[in-house]
C-alpha cells in the first residue's frame, strides 16, 4: 500500500489549532477544456450549498464565489481540515466567447459552466470569386487591332 507523506501537515494542523486560522489559503480547484464549439469549466466545491454560489461576469472577467459557513464554535473539534469561509476565483475569458449564453449547473459538489464560442469568432470560409474580364466581341477586337 502506498501512503502519501506530507511532513508539514502536522505542523499546519497544530498552527491552525493554536492560532485558529488555516495556514494555507482556501482554494477552488478547477479543470477547463474545449468541447466542439464551447468551453467547459468545472470547479470542485464539495459541501457548498447551491444557494451560496454567486457567479458574475463583468466585461470578460468571470467571478465565481462560494461560501462554506463556519462551524458552531461550541463544538469540540477533533479535526478541521476542510476550509471554511468565502472562496473566490476570477477567470479572464477571451473575446471569442459568448458571455451572454453561459450556462451553469451544480451537481454532486461540482459547479459546471458551459460557455459557447461566439458565432462571430467561429472559423468560416470566405468564397473567393475570380474576376472575369468580358471577352471582346469580334467587332470590338477588330476595332482594337485597327486602332
Swiss-Prot record:
One Pfam family from the record: HSP20
sHSP domain span: 21-131
Residues spanning the membrane: none
Protein origin, superkingdom: Bacteria
InterPro entries named in the record: A-crystallin/Hsp20_dom, HSP20-like_chaperone, Small_HSP
PROSITE patterns: SHSP
Coiled coil: none
UniProt similarity note: Belongs to the small heat shock protein (HSP20) family.
Record function comment: Not known. This protein is one of the major immune reactive proteins in mycobacteria.
Protein's recorded name: 18 kDa antigen 1
Originating organism: Mycobacterium avium
Amino acid at each position: 500500500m502506498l501512503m502519501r507523506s506530507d511532513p508539514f501537515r502536522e505542523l499546519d494542523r497544530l498552527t491552525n489549532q493554536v492560532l485558529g486560522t488555516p495556514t494555507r489559503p482556501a482554494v477552488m480547484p478547477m479543470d477547463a477544456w474545449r468541447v466542439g464549439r464551447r468551453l467547459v469549466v468545472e470547479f470542485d466545491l464539495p459541501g457548498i450549498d447551491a444557494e451560496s454560489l454567486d457567479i458574475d461576469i463583468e466585461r470578460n472577467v468571470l467571478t465565481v464565489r462560494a461560501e462554506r459557513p463556519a462551524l458552531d464554535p461550541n463544538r469540540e473539534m477533533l479535526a478541521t481540515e476542510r476550509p471554511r469561509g468565502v472562496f473566490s476565483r476570477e477567470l479572464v475569458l477571451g473575446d471569442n466567447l459568448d458571455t451572454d449564453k453561459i450556462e451553469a449547473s451544480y451537481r454532486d459538489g461540482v459547479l459546471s459552466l458551459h460557455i459557447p464560442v461566439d458565432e462571430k469568432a467561429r472559423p468560416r470560409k470566405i468564397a473567393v470569386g475570380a474576376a472575369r474580364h468580358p471577352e471582346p466581341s469580334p467587332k470590338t477586337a477588330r476595332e482594337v487591332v485597327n486602332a
